[in-house]
């Protein structure tokens, strides 16, 4: 009888990536098949996030529901991973004894052994250690699910912003070897992936080892990925301004595969607040980066993160943030009211901003950025946009839907054979959350660049010798 696995994922794209790897890993080692119904599962996994407020309460609320399922089925195994698990460790089991497995972001590759331990000994296991990059060496080959894919290139962060838990839950920065990354992307390209999103908590700090003992910079990695035939779009998330060096900006000048859209978190427009956050840059320095980017790629759109109501934020501080929003003309943002994360330096700061004031500021900020996003969308009417077709439209299965470089959903009339390919469409109308387009040309009529086939990348990157040790084949 087939064993079923249910995974609940909260949080960032890195967590989504990790959850997909868990599913692939447990399918290969234990034969688990995914189910969307928790009641059907033999194994329940919760991949948690601790960035936002009340993360712990949210976890224990769901575990209370899963406890009832375990009372009905004592053989059910419950596992909790991610950043809350990394923070709480053994204390998590003290509040939720129904949990059998507790693992951190860096130990998900050990899940098969942990599950075996529970099944053989009927005792729980906790592993929230930081074994650096080991997990990537023990995960199964990537499996494409559509024309887009996430690829993790590094883990952790060394910046220690005062509001952030990432360095404590995911560890400090560790970069994957460049050839391992190219090997994974080439495998995905061979399966039909056309767009990759390179992931890392501080992705532009990437410094990966090469086969010959050298170091590959993030800018160099971007060019190597762009050279793989079939990979015609590259995104990356998330960046830090102090690591956004000129060599990365130069890639925007000469590498069209790198999309004209960048998510670059700034958090605040007030230098005083940025200093309290330990962001290590000023608002003016952030604007200088954007100015150079727009010189290299005039049509680039910028999105960002904002924290409203950081401890001690005055009305003047907030007005400086709003000025930055207007000056940069952000397209979209992920903006939140500040909530203290246990164990971070900012959690000890006196919070003298009222909840009502925080909510009002957040509303003003989000409303302004929404207006700017609509202005950008309206300017797209009459333009020709290259769209990667992802599938049928949500509202009309007789139509297709895809995304532009700046992440706009476009619905248009087309044929099913276009799914997974690029098309050029003329934008004719704008809606609140999508655009309407008319098909102009298909991929067969385009001149997409071809540099190196996925098969040749696979052939020249990581191989294994007779005892399973990775070797490089030039």
Curated annotation (Swiss-Prot):
CDD domains: Radical_SAM. The keyword Glycoprotein does not apply. Its EC number is 2.8.4.3. PROSITE patterns: MTTASE_N (PS51449), MTTASE_RADICAL (PS01278), RADICAL_SAM (PS51918), TRAM (PS50926). It catalyses: N(6)-dimethylallyladenosine(37) in tRNA + (sulfur carrier)-SH + AH2 + 2 S-adenosyl-L-methionine = 2-methylsulfanyl-N(6)-dimethylallyladenosine(37) in tRNA + (sulfur carrier)-H + 5'-deoxyadenosine + L-methionine + A + S-adenosyl-L-homocysteine + 2 H(+). [4Fe-4S] cluster 1 binds at residues 12, 49, 83. One of its GO terms (molecular function) is 4 iron, 4 sulfur cluster binding. It is an enzyme of class 2 (transferase). It is found in: Cytoplasm. SMART domains: Elp3. Residues 143-375 form the Radical SAM core domain. The keyword Nucleotide-binding does not apply. Residues 3-120 form the MTTase N-terminal domain. Keywords: 4Fe-4S, Cytoplasm, Iron, Iron-sulfur, Metal-binding, S-adenosyl-L-methionine, Transferase, tRNA processing. Its cofactor is [4Fe-4S] cluster. [4Fe-4S] cluster 2 binds at residues 157, 161, 164. Residues 378-441 form the TRAM domain. GO terms for cellular component: cytosol. Its main location: cytoplasm. Monomer. Catalyzes the methylthiolation of N6-(dimethylallyl)adenosine (i(6)A), leading to the formation of 2-methylthio-N6-(dimethylallyl)adenosine (ms(2)i(6)A) at position 37 in tRNAs that read codons beginning with uridine. NCBIfam families: miaB-methiolase, MiaB/RimO family radical SAM methylthiotransferase. Belongs to the methylthiotransferase family. MiaB subfamily. This is tRNA-2-methylthio-N(6)-dimethylallyladenosine synthase. The lineage of its organism: Bacteria, Pseudomonadati, Pseudomonadota, Gammaproteobacteria, Enterobacterales.
């Amino acid at each position: 009888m087939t064993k079923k696995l249910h995974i609940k994922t909260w949080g960032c794209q890195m967590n989504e990536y990790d959850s997909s790897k868990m599913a692939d890993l447990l399918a290969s080692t234990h034969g688990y098949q995914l189910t969307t119904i928790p009641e059907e599962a033999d194994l329940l996994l919760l991949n948690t996030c601790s960035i936002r407020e009340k993360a712990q309460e949210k976890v224990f609320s769901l575990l209370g529901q899963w406890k009832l399922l375990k009372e009905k089925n004592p053989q059910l195994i419950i596992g909790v991973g991610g950043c809350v698990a990394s923070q709480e460790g053994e204390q998590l089991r003290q509040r939720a004894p129904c949990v059998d497995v507790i693992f951190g972001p860096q130990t998900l590759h050990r899940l098969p052994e942990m599950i075996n331990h529970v099944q053989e000994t009927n005792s729980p296991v906790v592993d929230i250690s930081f074994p650096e990059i080991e997990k990537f060496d023990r995960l199964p080959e990537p499996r494409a699910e559509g024309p887009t894919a996430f690829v993790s290139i590094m883990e952790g962060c060394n910046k220690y912003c005062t509001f952030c838990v990432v360095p404590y839950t995911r560890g400090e920065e560790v970069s994957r070897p460049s050839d391992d990354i190219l090997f994974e992307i080439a495998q995905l390209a061979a399966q039909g992936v056309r767009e990759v999103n390179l992931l890392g908590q501080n992705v532009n700090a990437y410094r990966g080892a090469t086969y010959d003992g050298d170091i590959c910079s993030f800018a160099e990695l971007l060019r190597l990925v762009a050279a793989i035939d079939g990979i015609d779009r590259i995104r990356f998330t998330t960046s830090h301004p102090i690591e956004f060096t000129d060599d990365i900006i130069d890639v925007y000048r000469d590498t069209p595969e790198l999309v004209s859209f960048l998510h670059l978190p700034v958090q605040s427009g007030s230098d005083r607040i940025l200093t309290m956050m330990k962001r290590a840059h000023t608002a003016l320095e952030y604007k200088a980066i954007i100015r150079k980017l727009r010189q290299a790629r005039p049509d680039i759109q910028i999105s960002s993160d904002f924290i409203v109501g950081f401890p001690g934020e005055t009305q003047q501080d907030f007005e400086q943030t709003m000025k930055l929003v207007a000056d940069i003309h952000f397209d979209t943002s992920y903006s939140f009211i500040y909530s203290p994360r246990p164990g971070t330096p900012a959690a000890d700061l006196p919070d003298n901003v009222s909840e009502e004031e925080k909510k009002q500021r957040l509303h003003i900020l989000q409303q302004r950025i929404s207006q700017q996003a609509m202005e950008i969308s309206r300017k797209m009417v009459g333009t020709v946009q290259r769209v990667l077709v992802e599938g049928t439209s949500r509202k009309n299965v007789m139509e297709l839907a895809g995304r532009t470089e700046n992440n706009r959903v476009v619905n248009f009339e087309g044929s099913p054979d276009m799914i997974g390919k690029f098309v050029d469409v003329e934008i004719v109308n704008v809606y609140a959350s999508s655009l309407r387009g008319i098909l102009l040309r298909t991929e067969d009529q385009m001149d997409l660049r071809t540099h190196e086939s996925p098969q040749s990348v696979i052939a020249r990157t990581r191989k294994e010798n007779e005892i399973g040790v990775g070797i490089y084949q030039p």
